[in-house]
Amino acid sequence: MHTGIIGWGSYVPKYRIKVSDIASVWGKEEGVVKALGLTEKSVPAADEDSTTMAIEASRDALTRAMIDPREVEMALFGSESKVYAVKSTSAILIDALGLSKFSLTADLEFACRAASAGLRMAFSMVESGQVSYSLVVGSDTAQSNPGDVLELSSAAAAVAFVVGRAEEASAVVEASTSYVTDTPDFWRRDGMPYPLHGEAFTGEPAYFAHIYEAVNRLLQDTGLKVSDFDYFVFHQPNGKFPFQMAKKLGVPLEKVKQGMVSTLIGNPYNASALLGFARVLDVAKPGQRVLVAPFGSGAGSDAYSFVITDKILERQKLAHTTDYYIQRKKLVDYASYAKTTHKFKVYD
């Protein structure tokens, strides 16, 4: 392909709650927290949502891209936690960021994989010459039923990428593939405030099977081997699954660590694997190769092979790193977290 990532940006709210505090409120055993491999999760402020976070991440991505925002002719937004059930967030991005009003826009849905599906679409549209640049954003204030195990991991963050031609790219996409089946591991019906999950399906039938198939197909199609890659980034529903996935594929664990964000902030759904990818781009060197494999319940996985170019060196310095947002933090208690994430029902 002749396309790639030109600019990237991250955003993580500064508030955190200890996973052990959530577990304590609901009387969960210490072993439950330990099994997830998590310590803290990010919490949105009272005035933050998936739209505001998307704007923050996109500003950094556009800064790194070093282009006029009006040249962006496509905006795709992937999220499980849209502010409006019926109103386009991607249209809000057009005006908020000063993108071209003659743009193709869409809000995408496929659980945690929606933004990744958007990336494949963006690469194709730029490759075909139908648009010059595309903005793809994944942003979630992840939802979870109070007391459910999901509440221990569901977090908030956003990540954005500007896609353009290979000659301008910081990371050129070599190849991509997808693997999708009808697997009922996680769902939320219309009108339900929180998702449900079929625990028997969440591990092997969903996460592991789909990522394995997508990555294996990518390696077969390209003729590349695990040893050809410097970094691997997998979807991160918790702090353990990505390392188990690495072992299943024969990937050295050292190649996974830089792309891990869930161990630091929890699982921000659409900003999970892609935020890990942004964290890799913050430190990657020219010539290095990165494999990225997002996953979305329902279920599907994409796999990408990226090669880093020398253009990344200048752009790494132009905006805040992912770690900047991860490291600036303020702890809150469960009551504050429950209030800002609207866990309480208020009746007038």
Curated annotation (Swiss-Prot):
Gene Ontology molecular function: 3-oxoacyl-[acyl-carrier-protein] synthase activity; acetyl-CoA C-acetyltransferase activity; hydroxymethylglutaryl-CoA synthase activity
Residues that, per the record, bind (3S)-3-hydroxy-3-methylglutaryl-CoA: E29, C112, S153, T202, H235, N267, S297
SUPFAM superfamilies membership: Thiolase-like
The EC number(s) this enzyme carries: 2.3.3.10
Active-site residues, Swiss-Prot/TrEMBL: E80 (proton donor/acceptor), C112 (acyl-thioester intermediate), H235 (proton donor/acceptor)
An individual GO BP term: secondary metabolite biosynthetic process
Family: Belongs to the thiolase-like superfamily. Archaeal HMG-CoA synthase family.
Protein name, UniProt field: Hydroxymethylglutaryl-CoA synthase
Organism: Metallosphaera sedula (strain ATCC 51363 / DSM 5348 / JCM 9185 / NBRC 15509 / TH2)
